[in-house]
Amino acid sequence: MSKKDIKKVVLAYSGGLDTSIILKWLQDEYNAEVITFTADLGQGEEVEPARQKAIACGIKPENVFILDIKEEFVKDYVFPMFRANAIYEGEYLLGTSIARPLIAKKLVEIANQKGAEAVSHGATGKGNDQVRFELGALALNPDLKVIAPWREWTLNSRESLLEYAKKNGIEISQKHVDENGNPKISPYSMDANLLHISYEGLHLENPANEPEESMWLWTNSPEQAPDEAEYITIGYKNGDPISINGKELSPATLLKTLNDYGNKHGIGRVDIVENRYVGMKARGCYETPGGTIMLKAHRAIESLTLDREAAHLKDELMPRYAKLIYQGYWFSPEREMLQAAIDATQKNVEGTVRLKLYKGNVTVVGRESSKSLYDDAYSTFEKDEVYNQKDAEGFIRLNALRFIIAGKKNNKK
């Protein structure tokens, strides 16, 4: 598809400097009508100003889409991922990764509604997000062209971006320039939604540097967290959390409430070096307070209700599932296949988990379920009437048979 074939473009638009520059660049470079989409994923920033900024850039009011998709995000993306207990490379709870397929889905839906030939995003050519956005868009509508300005334009420095903005009358906030109009050192590259906030860049680019305490925007430091522990109870049904302390909550409200608990008690900070899909290593710091609590609770209720072999197989599949999400394959048949298998294990994952929150730690202190496979008649250390300990002898000997045979053979040598 050539440039002249593109009449309408749907842009993932934050209202910030970079996407405002992209908006103008699309108008000039493609001579296309731009439609903006701003997602409210619970990032904690006011999204309505994006409407006025888009209109100020010449976008028709009917072409400005601002959608509150927090409930859909948590219910249809975050919760399914947590049923899998997904963690990438042992520590990353995939807060950015899981938001991208939903944004891609909305871009495609708006493009279909408005008859657009293309969608566009502000991800750079060095990161994972370009892959996530584009795999999602192409999986849902392969006829769409995806425009990635960072891979096309010559605006390859902060100075050139600011110069372009000045030239085209794009508003530049004080966080980007000093009192003389010169570029400031860029702030951390941050991304936030209801599940997490991430930080990259600046002194974090040296993996030896400890993050500054002022960087962390959500959580108290564990040292400054309350000196008294707090206990909460999370209720589960079909593998998803449905209540806190007996009160049923919507998915987004539940996650927001867990975030509040986690922030208060300094829970959910991680500092990792991860392997990006494009091949390089990158250092990132993340705050995932509610997700950290949720993961602990979910594993606890599964420990009561999942069959042993189903649980072990699920743990074996988890790294592959997490990798698919990290690399942008949410809409792939293999992810959907794994999801179906994971969801099949969750029908009896219900009950309550009691947790102790204290200075960065989440400790499980109790769990109950009407579907529990734990039977104290068998598990007791006291006298029981149901388990004949002599049965273990044959069980052990049969499982040791290969060792016995091999040992006899080896002893003959």
From Swiss-Prot:
Q: Where does ATP bind?
A: A12, Y13, S14, G15, G16, L17, D18, T19, S20, A39, G122
Q: Pathway involvement?
A: Amino-acid biosynthesis; L-arginine biosynthesis; L-arginine from L-ornithine and carbamoyl phosphate: step 2/3
Which residues does the record give as L-aspartate binding sites?
T124, N128, D129
- Its primary localisation, in coarse terms, equals cytoplasm
- Keyword Metal-binding tagged: no
Q: Where does L-citrulline bind?
A: Y92, S97, N128, R132, S189, S198, E274, Y286
Q: Which SUPFAM superfamilies match?
A: Adenine nucleotide alpha hydrolases-like, Argininosuccinate synthetase, C-terminal domain
Q: Where in the cell is it found?
A: Cytoplasm
Q: Which UniProt keywords apply?
A: Amino-acid biosynthesis, Arginine biosynthesis, ATP-binding, Cytoplasm, Ligase, Nucleotide-binding
InterPro entries (alphabetical): Arginosuc_syn_C, Arginosuc_syn_N, Arginosuc_synth, Arginosuc_synth_CS, Arginosuc_synth_type_1_subfam, AS_cat/multimer_dom_body, Rossmann-like_a/b/a_fold
HAMAP family recorded: Arg_succ_synth_type1
Of which family is this protein a member? Belongs to the argininosuccinate synthase family. Type 1 subfamily.
On assembly, the entry states:
Homotetramer.
Q: What is this protein called?
A: Argininosuccinate synthase
**Source taxonomy lineage?**
Bacteria, Pseudomonadati, Campylobacterota, Epsilonproteobacteria, Campylobacterales
What is the gene name? argG
